Swiss-Prot record:
UniProt-listed GO biological process terms: proton motive force-driven plasma membrane ATP synthesis
Name this polypeptide is given: ATP synthase gamma chain
Keywords: ATP synthesis, Cell membrane, CF(1), Hydrogen ion transport, Ion transport, Membrane, Transport
Gene source species: Pediococcus pentosaceus (strain ATCC 25745 / CCUG 21536 / LMG 10740 / 183-1w)
Family: Belongs to the ATPase gamma chain family.
Entries under SUPFAM superfamilies matching the protein: ATP synthase (F1-ATPase), gamma subunit (SSF52943)
Protein's gene: atpG
Membrane topology listed for this record: Peripheral membrane protein
Source taxon at top rank: Bacteria
Length: 306
């Protein structure tokens, strides 16, 4: 059944309105991406300095000495808790997704590859503890009857450092209470405006040996004088290091999210433009057919009158 000119015209108008919306959303996402990239550049300098100090302490064997002494603190996050290692019975996964859709394959990629990582390491529902930052990940696991031990929704478009302190405090407390024995952060790492890659980072326990042996810190010397004591220094720097890991992951994930949203909206706008072009061609053909029919009818009527 042929579509009438009016129906085609309505579809063209509707598609143009949709294209205006997706174009506006693309511009918003691009602006957010530029904003968070400027913010991230400054933060990376801080994060690298903190990691360098922790690596320095690891090479000085001060971190292992602190664990041996079990130096506790009255502060919310204890350095000894962050360093304490024990046999792994349960593994926690802090999964970072977005709160909404319209981000292409961003969320499905994180969830799928996190599940693949769990399967590869033999972690089942019984020994995998899910902690979700972002509503999409939380809803996914809940809809599949998987308990979500912790969720955090409403992360800002450009997250602040204070936002993640609640997350770090909560997951550290859960680790101290032995709700899980190790914790991984799973998220999409921003590569460029067109692509991202899945990344898994071990957050807890903080591995001093891993940092000390990291090739990136080979030039770090192992001579540190600490005041007032190694324990006091660790108590200050290790919570900051844990916060920097989580904050850095969330910043990275948010950057990838904005890039994915911008790319998805650009693709939607391009598809809308192609559809409009096809509909306009279809409309013009219908108009041409109608005009040809009218001319034929007029010519036929005139011939009948002669």
């Amino acid at each position: 059944m042929a579509i009438s000119e009016q129906d085609v015209k309505r579809r063209i108008d509707s598609t143009k309105k949709t294209s205006q919306i997706t174009t506006a959303m693309q511009m918003v996402s691009t602006a957010k991406l530029s904003q968070i990239q400027r913010h991230t550049v400054g933060y990376q300098v801080y994060a690298q300095k903190v990691e360098s100090i922790v690596a320095h302490l690891a090479k000085s064997h001060l971190m292992s000495a602190s664990v041996a002494g079990k130096a506790k603190s009255d502060q919310a996050i204890s350095a000894a808790d962050l360093l304490a290692q024990r046999p792994v019975k349960k593994t926690g996964y802090l999964i970072i997704t977005s709160d909404r859709g319209l981000v292409g394959s961003y969320n499905s990629s994180v969830i799928k590859q996190t599940n693949d990582f769990m399967q590869k390491h033999g972690h089942t529902e019984g020994d995998a503890v899910i902690l979700a930052v972002g509503g999409t990940g939380s809803d996914f696991y809940r809809n599949r009857n998987h308990e979500v031990a912790y969720e955090y929704r409403g992360v800002s478009d450009v997250p602040t450092f204070n936002e993640i302190r609640e997350i770090v405090k909560t997951v550290t407390k859960m680790y101290t209470e032995e709700k899980f024995d190790e914790l991984y952060v799973c998220y999409n790492h921003f590569v460029n405006r067109l692509s991202n890659s899945f990344r898994v980072t071990k957050l807890l326990p903080i591995g001093g040996d891993d940092l000390a042996n990291n090739e990136a810190h080979e030039q770090v010397t192992a001579e540190y004088d600490t005041e007032p004591s190694p324990e006091a220094l660790l108590q200050e720097i290790l919570p900051q290091y844990a916060e920097s890991l989580v904050y850095g992951a969330i910043l990275d994930a948010k950057t990838a999210e904005h890039a994915a949203s911008s790319s998805a909206m650009r693709s939607a706008s391009d598809n809308a433009s192609d559809l409009i072009a096809d509909l306009e061609l279809q409309y013009n053909r219908a108009r041409q057919s109608a005009i040809t029919t009218e001319i034929t009818e007029i010519t036929g009527g005139q011939a009948a009158l002669e």
